[in-house]
Amino acid sequence: GATYSGKLMIVKDPSRLFVGTVPEFTNGNGMVVADIAKRYDAIGGVNGGEFVDGETTYTAMPIGLVMKDGEILNDNGGTSHVTGITFDNKLVLGNMNAAKAKELNIRDCVSISNHIGPFLIVNGEAQDIVGIAGGTNPRTAIGQTADGKILLLAVDGRQPNSIGATFSDLQDIMAQYGAVNA
């Protein structure tokens, strides 16, 4: 786009998608995405979920629900804005608690509690994102196409050559690549 540059990874086999984490969620034990990808011998990765920015640069303290391989790694006890993948490799989006995530057979998920980003497309329908603040910023999005491919998008921002993307930009990109959920 005119205001941003980014990278889109298309994962043809959704069973290869997983949540990678730091070894333990404790203040000061965070890692950058590249180091987490190396830890899991992954060929790519994106930031996901919401975390506390404490007094250190890498805090590793998630705020909401985090699940890996069906196990709850972190739970704030409330309802979170969840993005997850089920054991049958379907992308699931919704506001839910840990019990609901288990009921939906979610294998891996991350969440945000402060609703810092909207769901862009749900069941093939572009969501109304008018009035959602945010402007142009670095952005990360995930989507799934009707045939199951996973779309992982990372847009650079706050740089001279890429000030960032809006939520509307992300919605357009996901739709362009055939996302039915994003």
Residue ranges of model-derived segments:
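Short, solvent-exposed aromatic-acidic interface loops
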Residues: 23-29, 96-102, 155-159
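Active-site-adjacent helix-turn-beta-strand microarchitecture at beta-sheet edges
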Residues: 51-133
